[in-house]
């Protein structure tokens, strides 16, 4: 749901941004305005700690944990569990995602808790009798669910990098589920718009989110007694309760009764994985993001590397020339995504080649500022030898400078719409993120290849891109977004707006966005760009499509004195950045 003031705000942002795109070969990046003087858009400010999330109640849970002495990881896990209660559209126990952690001493690590295909999954399981993808199977059936990873990921993070016990950080979520909370605008709207398509088809789901034959409305109280019991068991017995105990039994029985594939053995075998983040240097800043099976980190760094080959400062924010260069760079990156990206435990992902600056230069040499290249003429690049809206994001920074960026999901809104037995837990439809048939797009229009084909115990490719930017050796920007295929370009523009433009975090958040993903061959834009600019882009050969808002960033910027500046996205309602 888009805030009524959003379009007016992005229009102002576009006018105020001025000339701000720049590249490494250009003069130094402009100094950052942290939003304390003449800027129109002002971030939230705090001294000790800050949380930015899509839900105000969950944000407050995180702030309370920080106030009680918890670190950023403690708060991040508490927020994640709270969102599973208050933002069931995407917050979850039955899904998965990624967490990026940067400690106060500068160590940065990535935790992969992406869902896994069950052991009985087969390559062609989502094809019909004619050999074509069947979206009902991959989106709304019990076959659509991968083995969930959220509980394992949160436990790995808490055990290794947190300071509080599990029962402490789960307690706020348990109370919210047991006692209930007031349904806000965002949840009411999504229940009506998206929930109506999947939730009423399943009695367990309908019993939770429906009242007298209608979806819950704003102002109603949502009590989730069964979810409270599951949270209580996890708090008392740890992740084994989810993967080997009563909850595992409920999930396995739900699958067995309804033709799903997840078994108790799949759940018992699931492990979250700690990985080395993807990193790159851009104009004196270090950018850290998720490695595969996320494609986000690789392609954010790849596109930034391409942009370094252009002196973009003279073009200005939102100009046709600047947008042309970025859109063309995005086409090449998404073409590579379709060919090379997959689960690194199963396929060799050429991440070093894709993030190589020489490779970026070879792409930049093919970009014509005056003429768009049709997507049909763009093919995945020839690489050097191997060396390898329905989501939610939140960011946390604590008083010591520890930072956490988390993006996790059920895939589409409310996932399959299936609640597993009496667990109160909604299940994901993440299997749709595999390439059911190479060359055929998924629900987000993304095209994949053999590297992302369905396979047993494999993790599907993702666009989720929790990102941390470092300046002068210190955490500077913590950001991320939902948005399916548009996550990568949304996060990219937050980084570019902040570094190249000197925008404060609120300005960078409010600025209008655009997106090109190679296929379909269209340049998707939000309202807020000049009509003349869009006409110029069309004259260059871009197929401009004016569509709804993109992304919902939740970001925190750290000033040179350690003061925190945060912003929640005006494209969402009921989100909140808060600190103390």
In which residue ranges do the predicted regions lie?
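Active-site rim segments in enzyme catalytic domains, especially the processed small/beta chain
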Residues: 85-110, 261-263, 403-471, 501, ...
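Extended C-terminal subregions enriched in glycine
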Residues: 458, 500-548
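Short, small/polar residue-rich loop motifs at catalytic or cofactor-binding pockets
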Residues: 274, 388-391, 413, 462-464
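Gram-negative bacterial Sec-dependent N-terminal signal peptides
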Residues: 2-24
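Noncatalytic scaffold domains of N-terminal-nucleophile
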Residues: 26-60, 72-73, 77-238, 242-244, ...
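Internal maturation/activation junctions in enzymes
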Residues: 310-410, 422-423, 438-439, 447
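Alpha-helical support elements that line or immediately flank enzyme active sites
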Residues: 65-66, 152-160, 237-244, 249, ...
């Amino acid at each position: 749901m888009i805030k009524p003031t959003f379009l007016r705000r992005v229009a102002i942002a576009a006018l105020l941004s001025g000339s701000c795109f720049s590249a490494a070969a250009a003069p130094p990046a402009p100094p950052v305005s942290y939003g304390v003087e003449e800027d129109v858009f002002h971030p939230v400010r705090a001294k000790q700690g800050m949380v930015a999330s899509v839900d105000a109640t969950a944000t407050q849970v995180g702030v309370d944990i920080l106030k009680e002495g918890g670190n950023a990881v403690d708060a991040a896990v508490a927020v994640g569990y709270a969102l599973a209660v208050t933002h069931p559209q995407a917050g979850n126990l039955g899904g998965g995602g990624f967490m990026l952690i940067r400690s106060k001493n500068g160590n940065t690590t990535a935790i992969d808790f992406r869902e896994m295909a069950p052991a009985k999954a087969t390559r062609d399981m989502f094809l019909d009798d004619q050999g074509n993808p069947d979206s009902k199977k991959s989106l709304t059936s019990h076959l659509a669910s991968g083995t969930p990873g959220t509980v394992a990921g949160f436990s790995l993070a808490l055990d290794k990098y947190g300071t509080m016990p599990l029962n402490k950080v789960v307690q706020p979520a348990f109370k919210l589920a047991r006692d209930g909370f007031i349904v806000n605008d965002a949840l009411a709207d999504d229940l009506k718009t998206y929930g109506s398509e999947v939730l009423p088809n399943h009695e367990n789901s309908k019993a939770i989110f429906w009242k007298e034959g209608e979806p819950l409305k704003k102002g109603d109280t949502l009590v989730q007694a069964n979810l409270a019991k599951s949270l209580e068991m996890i708090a008392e017995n740890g992740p084994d309760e989810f993967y080997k105990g009563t909850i595992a039994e409920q999930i396995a029985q739900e699958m067995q009764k309804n033709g799903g594939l997840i078994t108790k053995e799949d759940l018992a075998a699931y492990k979250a994985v700690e990985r080395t983040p993807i990193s790159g240097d851009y104009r004196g800043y270090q950018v850290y993001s998720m490695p595969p099976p996320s494609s986000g980190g690789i392609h954010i760094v790849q596109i930034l590397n391409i942009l370094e080959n252009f002196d973009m400062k003279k073009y200005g924010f939102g100009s046709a020339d600047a947008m042309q260069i970025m859109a063309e760079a995005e086409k090449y990156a998404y073409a590579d995504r379709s060919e090379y990206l997959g689960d690194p435990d199963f396929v060799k992902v050429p991440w070093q080649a894709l993030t190589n600056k020489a490779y970026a230069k070879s792409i930049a040499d093919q970009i014509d500022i005056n003429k768009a290249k049709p997507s049909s003429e763009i093919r995945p690049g020839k690489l050097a030898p191997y060396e390898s809206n329905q989501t939610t994001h939140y960011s946390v920074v604590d008083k010591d400078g520890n930072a956490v960026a988390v993006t996790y999901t059920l895939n589409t809104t409310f996932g399959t719409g299936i609640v597993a037995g009496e667990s109160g837990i909604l299940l994901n439809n993440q299997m749709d993120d595999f390439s059911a048939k190479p060359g055929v797009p998924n629900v987000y229009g993304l095209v994949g290849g053999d590297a992302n084909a369905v396979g047993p115990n494999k993790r599907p490719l993702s666009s989720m891109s929790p990102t941390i930017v470092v300046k002068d050796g210190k955490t500077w920007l913590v950001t991320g977004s939902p948005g399916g295929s548009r996550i990568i370009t949304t996060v990219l523009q937050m980084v570019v707006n902040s570094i190249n433009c000197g925008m404060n975090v609120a300005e960078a958040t409010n600025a209008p966005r655009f997106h090109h993903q190679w296929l379909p061959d269209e340049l998707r834009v939000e309202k807020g760009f000049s009509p003349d600019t869009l006409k110029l882009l069309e004259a260059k050969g871009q197929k401009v499509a004016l569509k709804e808002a993109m992304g919902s960033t939740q970001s925190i910027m750290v000033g040179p004195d350690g003061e925190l500046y945060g912003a929640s996205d005006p494209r969402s309602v009921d989100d909140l950045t808060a600190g103390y």
